[in-house]
């Protein structure tokens, strides 16, 4: 039915998916690329597909591209991950400030790199926390320290000086 991923396409090859859609592609095609013009709830393909279908779109400014990505993420995927392609630090920082994700890969492969890699500092895992955006308790890669119970002993320190509001807030 329209609006749902066809289960037979999940994990299938690009050639198989194209055949399901009545499109001829070489048997060794690695992925299908589709141009979309809408975002978020207005575009069925602007969400997780679990198959080798890549959607592309045009944009005029970096801010427009980030806004479109944010619309898609808020529809499906908030808290998870994204990848940006840029060597402009201001663009990278802007994406980091605007996008509701727990991981932003910069100029890397997201499907394997954001699950942790020796060259990006993320803990290797198959479980990616999505934080409160995704109704998870963690917003980082699940790691052994999340599975260890730690007891902390707290003892009142009598000589502690409690700061005034002025000292705290200036």
Regions found by a protein language model. Name each.
Residues 18:
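Substrate-access "cap/lid" subdomains that shape
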Residues 23-170:
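Conserved C-terminal structural/oligomerization subdomain of aldehyde/semialdehyde dehydrogenase
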Residues 1-15, 44-48:
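Flexible, acidic loop-helix segments that line cofactor/substrate-binding pockets
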């Amino acid at each position: 039915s329209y609006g749902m991923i066809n289960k037979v396409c999940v994990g299938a090859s690009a050639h198989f998916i194209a055949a399901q859609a009545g499109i001829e592609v070489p048997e060794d095609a690695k992925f299908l690329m589709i141009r979309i013009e809408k975002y978020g709830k207005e575009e069925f393909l602007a969400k997780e597909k679990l198959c080798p279908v890549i959607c592309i779109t045009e944009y005029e400014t970096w801010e427009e591209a980030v806004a479109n990505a944010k619309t898609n993420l808020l529809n499906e995927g908030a808290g998870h991950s994204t990848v940006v392609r840029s060597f402009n630090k201001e663009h990278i920082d802007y994406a980091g400030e605007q996008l509701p994700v727990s991981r932003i890969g910069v100029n890397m492969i997201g499907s394997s790199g954001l699950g942790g890699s020796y060259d990006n500092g993320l803990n290797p895992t198959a479980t990616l926390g999505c934080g409160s955006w995704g109704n998870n308790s963690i917003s980082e890669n699940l790691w052994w320290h999340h599975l260890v119970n730690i007891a902390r002993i707290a003892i009142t320190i009598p000589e502690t000086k409690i700061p005034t509001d002025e000292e705290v807030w200036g």
